[in-house]
Amino acid sequence: MHLLGFFSVACSLLAAALLPGPREAPAAAAAFESGLDLSDAEPDAGEATAYASKDLEEQLRSVSSVDELMTVLYPEYWKMYKCQLRKGGWQHNREQANLNSRTEETIKFAAAHYNTEILKSIDNEWRKTQCMPREVCIDVGKEFGVATNTFFKPPCVSVYRCGGCCNSEGLQCMNTSTSYLSKTLFEITVPLSQGPKPVTISFANHTSCRCMSKLDVYRQVHSIIRRSLPATLPQCQAANKTCPTNYMWNNHICRCLAQEDFMFSSDAGDDSTDGFHDICGPNKELDEETCQCVCRAGLRPASCGPHKELDRNSCQCVCKNKLFPSQCGANREFDENTCQCVCKRTCPRNQPLNPGKCACECTESPQKCLLKGKKFHHQTCSCYRRPCTNRQKACEPGFSYSEEVCRCVPSYWKRPQMS
């Protein structure tokens, strides 16, 4: 297939993806804003779709190989396809069976690119046209602007200069580093006063190239130190946050949006898109090294913490002990976060809870009350002082009345009353 034909197919698919269709805005998107309050105005479904479509268009225009193109359109299936190629061929397996839930148009388009010869042919043609140093012949006289009565033999030399196509009309293929080659030629001047004179001339030879914008070219030409300039990207006031499951970060509106707004599909209302981009199932992803479905984000048994273990089928941390609420006993409940039975008993103020025994325990005792000069009350679990029945109205000088012994005692015996 010719490269132009491939681009025509890709453009038609892009147009299909950009066609507006009836669709409801994701209700949960409002809860996952970054850098904005919940009270801020949410973009409507049309705005979100427009940004998503623009992102898709920019990604398609910026791809520079078949691998990048397929990664944008079919990320999970493309991983599986490359895995199967490394293992010796595309075989129908459990993961590929999920294709049955896709739309017929999408299956046909994806299946067309599973032909290895087509992919290889397109990729070879693509590589030939990329921006890179290419061997060219340059006219020596035109290169240096010599007088019309002077010419060189051979008239041309072979050097490397940057050439090829860029992925955007706003970019041009330019050299980022240059070396100089010395070549020996015959210089002839007419009228001929002497024979051809051997001369050594240095020619610029491009060693590396890059697609650059006009602004980057201007900066590089006018820079004292030649260096590549990083492309400027739009910056969000808030940092790129980790989005919830099935949501992706959008740099244009600086918030999380549902993945379905970003995914390529011929039918905007197809609710089976999520499975198309997730052939391994929920909480799993394809490991390109082993070609096996593994838990996302490198989840391992050690990541689950105490009292939990990793369920490799669901890729979720589950409780080891398999306890049920009925097994916890009276006044206890099963805590799914800690995977343990926790005490839920409510105790009176003067009988604090002992979490280990899950019992209300009295903190006072007859011995403790006696040391305070009080008596112990069993029903209330508290110390109390019995009132004096024969209280004296006055004590002699140097004495004071003691509520503890109900008599006058020397004042220096008096100690602060204990509650």
UniProtKB/Swiss-Prot annotation:
The keyword Repeat applies. Residues 280-362 are annotated as: 4 X 16 AA repeats of C-X(10)-C-X-C-X(1,3)-C. Glycans are attached at residues 175, 205, 240. One of its GO terms (cellular component) is membrane. It is found in: Secreted. Expressed in the spleen. Expressed in the lymph node, thymus, appendix and bone marrow. Expressed in the heart, placenta, skeletal muscle, ovary and small intestine. Expressed in the prostate, testis and colon. Undergoes a complex proteolytic maturation which generates a variety of processed secreted forms with increased activity toward VEGFR-3, but only the fully processed form could activate VEGFR-2. VEGF-C first form an antiparallel homodimer linked by disulfide bonds. Before secretion, a cleavage occurs between Arg-227 and Ser-228 producing a heterotetramer. The next extracellular step of the processing removes the N-terminal propeptide. Finally the mature VEGF-C is composed mostly of two VEGF homology domains (VHDs) bound by non-covalent interactions. Sequence repeats lie at residues 280-295, 304-319, 328-343, 347-362. One of its GO terms (biological process) is positive regulation of angiogenesis. Its main location: secreted. It holds the Pfam family CXCXC. Residues 32-111, 228-419 form a propeptide. Residues 1-31 form the signal peptide. Keywords: Angiogenesis, Cleavage on pair of basic residues, Developmental protein, Differentiation, Disulfide bond, Glycoprotein, Growth factor, Mitogen, Repeat, Secreted, Signal. Changing residue 227 to S: No proteolytic processing and lower effect on VEGFR-2 and VEGFR-3. CDD domains: PDGF. Disulfide bonds join 131-173, 162-209, 166-211. GO terms for molecular function: chemoattractant activity; growth factor activity; vascular endothelial growth factor receptor 3 binding. Homodimer; non-covalent and antiparallel. Interacts with FLT4/VEGFR3; the interaction is required for FLT4/VEGFR3 homodimarization and activation. Growth factor active in angiogenesis, and endothelial cell growth, stimulating their proliferation and migration and also has effects on the permeability of blood vessels. May function in angiogenesis of the venous and lymphatic vascular systems during embryogenesis, and also in the maintenance of differentiated lymphatic endothelium in adults. Binds and activates KDR/VEGFR2 and FLT4/VEGFR3 receptors. Belongs to the PDGF/VEGF growth factor family. It is linked to Lymphatic malformation 4: A form of primary lymphedema, a disease characterized by swelling of body parts due to developmental anomalies and functional defects of the lymphatic system. Patients with lymphedema may suffer from recurrent local infections. LMPHM4 is an autosomal dominant form with onset at birth or in early childhood. Affected individuals manifest lymphedema of lower limbs with prominent veins, and impaired lymphatic uptake and drainage. Additional features are nail dysplasia, skin hyperkeratosis and papillomatosis. This is Vascular endothelial growth factor C. It comes from Homo sapiens (Human).
